[in-house]
């Protein structure tokens, strides 16, 4: 079998709820190289974070934990690996393992997710364009 490791399972910290349309990044920030962190995209994509917040509250979890748990629930061969350099982030990430979903919940979330019109090019897509 082949495993699948999703790129950026916590969206470069976006699900940490510390960015919004007023966020500005230093010239050295990795966020400057990603379309989805432009002010316009952050404003438009707020609906995704709002949806993650609603569901994370339902699951008594953080949006980051919800994001990781949802990815884990998709298929047994999907293995999200969030990069972290801080112990408290690792502990938060591990909390995703305690979250479960019913098939009905997964279907409901998927329908809500598909109704959101996201802005910005995904990181790997912009990398491919440079080739």
Annotated model-derived regions:
Residues 69-70:
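Hydrophobic, secondary-structure "cap" segments at the distal end of domains
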Residues 66:
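Glycine/threonine-rich phosphate-binding loop and adjacent beta-strand/alpha-helix elements that clamp
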